[in-house]
C-alpha cells in the first residue's frame, strides 16, 4: 500500500500510541486536539508528557489544533476521543470534511442517554457520501506497551470486509497485528463493557481479595457481557476472541488500566469523584456502567456485576457490601441465561 495521510483525532495515550504505529509504517500522521499547549509540545519537543514521561515521538508526526487543516486531503480519519465528545467531534468533522475518506475508531464506550455504540454515532453524524463503512479497531492493548513497540494483537471489525482489510494493512507490522472481523456489534460492545468488569476487578484488589476472586469476576463478567451483547445482535463467539476475553484479561488484571486503578481506589474506600479528579484522565468504565445498566434494564438482561458496580458508583453502595450481595444471590447453573444461538 502507498503511504496514507491519516488524521488521528484525540491526542490521549491511545491516540498517541496508534499514531506511532501508523508513523512506523510510513504513513503521514496528523494528530488533532484542542489543547494548544499539548499540540505545541508534540510539534516542538516531540513529546506528550501528560501521558508518556519518557517517550520521544518521531518528528514526522505533526499536531494540529485546527480540524480543517488536519483533515485536508487525508485518506483516513481515526477517532480516538472520549465517548462523551464523539458526537460533537463527528459533527465538526462533517462540517469541514470535503471528500470521501475511510473512517475508523478506537474508542471504547456507550453514549450516555442514547446507549449508542461509537460506530452508530459516526454513522448518524457523518454523511454516507463522505465515508465508507465504519471500522472498529479494538482489542487487548495498553498504550504504555504499544508506545514502546511491545507486541500487540487486536481486531478490525467492519460490515465491509474491504474496509477492515484497509485497517489491517495500514496498521500491521512486526509488533502490531490486526485480525479482521465482521461482527461490529460484538467487537464494540466487548471493548466497551469490559471496562465495567475492570472496575470491579480493581475493586476486589483494593478490598484485599485474592486471585480466586479476580478470576471469578472476569469469568462471570464475560458471561454477562456476552448476554447483553447477544441481545444487541452480536455473535457470541466474538467474546471468546481478542476483543472479548483478550481485552477483558488485559484490562481486568493490569495496573496500566485506568479502569482497574479506579476500581482499586474504590475498593480502598475512595469516592469516584475524587478518583477521577486525581487521575486527570477519562475513566470510560464509569459512564459505560450507567449506560450498560440502563440498557440491561430496558432489554431485561441479568447483569448482577454491572448492577452492583452501578450501585457503588451512583448510589453510594459500599463496595464490600456489593460483593456480599452478589455472593448471596440465588444459586444457579453456570451456563444459565447464555443463549449461544441467540
Curated annotation (Swiss-Prot):
Active site: 194 (proton acceptor)
Binding sites annotated in the UniProt record for NADPH: 13-14, 108, 143, 258, 282, 284
Binding site for sn-glycerol 3-phosphate: 108, 139, 141, 194, 247, 257-259
InterPro entries recorded: 6-PGluconate_DH-like_C_sf, 6PGD_dom2, G3P_DH_NAD-dep, G3P_DH_NAD-dep_C, G3P_DH_NAD-dep_N, NAD(P)-bd_dom_sf
EC assignment: 1.1.1.94
GO biological-process terms attached to the record: carbohydrate metabolic process; glycerol-3-phosphate biosynthetic process; glycerol-3-phosphate catabolic process; glycerophospholipid metabolic process; phospholipid biosynthetic process
Name by which UniProt lists this protein: Glycerol-3-phosphate dehydrogenase [NAD(P)+]
Biological source species: Lactococcus lactis subsp. cremoris (strain SK11)
Amino acid at each position: 500500500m502507498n503511504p496514507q495521510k491519516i488524521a488521528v483525532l484525540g491526542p490521549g495515550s491511545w491516540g498517541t500510541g496508534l499514531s506511532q504505529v501508523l508513523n512506523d509504517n510510513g504513513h503521514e500522521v496528523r494528530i488533532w486536539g484542542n489543547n494548544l499547549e499539548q499540540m505545541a509540545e508534540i510539534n516542538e519537543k516531540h513529546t506528550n508528557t501528560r501521558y508518556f514521561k519518557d517517550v520521544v515521538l518521531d518528528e514526522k508526526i505533526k499536531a494540529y489544533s485546527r480540524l480543517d487543516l488536519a483533515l485536508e486531503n487525508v485518506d483516513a480519519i481515526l477517532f480516538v476521543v472520549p465517548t462523551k465528545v464523539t458526537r460533537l467531534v463527528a459533527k465538526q468533522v462533517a462540517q469541514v470534511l470535503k471528500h470521501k475518506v475511510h473512517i475508523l475508531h478506537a474508542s471504547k464506550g456507550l453514549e450516555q442517554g442514547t446507549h449508542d455504540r461509537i460506530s452508530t454515532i459516526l454513522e448518524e453524524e457523518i454523511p454516507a457520501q463522505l465515508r465508507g463503512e465504519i471500522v472498529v479497531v479494538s482489542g487487548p492493548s495498553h498504550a504504555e506497551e504499544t508506545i514502546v513497540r511491545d507486541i500487540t494483537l487486536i481486531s478490525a471489525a467492519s460490515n465491509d470486509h474491504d474496509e477492515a482489510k484497509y485497517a489491517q494493512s495500514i496498521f500491521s507490522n512486526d509488533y502490531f497485528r490486526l485480525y479482521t472481523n465482521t461482527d461490529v456489534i460484538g467487537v464494540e460492545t466487548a471493548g466497551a463493557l469490559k471496562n465495567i468488569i475492570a472496575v470491579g476487578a480493581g475493586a476486589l484488589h483494593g478490598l484485599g481479595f485474592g486471585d480466586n476472586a479476580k478470576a471469578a469476576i472476569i469469568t462471570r463478567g464475560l458471561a454477562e457481557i456476552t448476554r447483553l451483547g447477544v441481545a444487541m445482535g452480536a455473535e457470541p463467539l466474538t467474546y471468546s476472541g481478542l476483543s472479548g476475553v483478550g481485552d477483558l484479561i488485559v484490562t481486568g488484571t493490569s495496573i496500566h488500566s485506568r479502569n482497574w486503578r479506579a476500581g482499586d481506589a474504590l475498593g480502598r474506600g475512595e469516592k469516584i469523584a475524587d478518583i477521577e479528579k486525581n487521575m486527570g484522565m477519562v475513566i470510560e468504565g464509569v459512564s459505560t456502567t450507567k449506560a450498560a445498566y440502563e440498557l440491561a434494564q430496558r432489554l431485561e438482561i441479568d447483569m448482577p456485576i454491572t448492577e452492583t458496580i452501578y450501585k457503588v458508583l451512583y448510589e453510594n453502595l459500599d463496595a464490600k457490601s456489593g460483593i456480599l450481595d452478589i455472593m448471596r444471590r440465588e444459586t444457579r447453573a453456570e451456563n444459565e441465561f447464555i443463549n449461544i444461538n441467540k
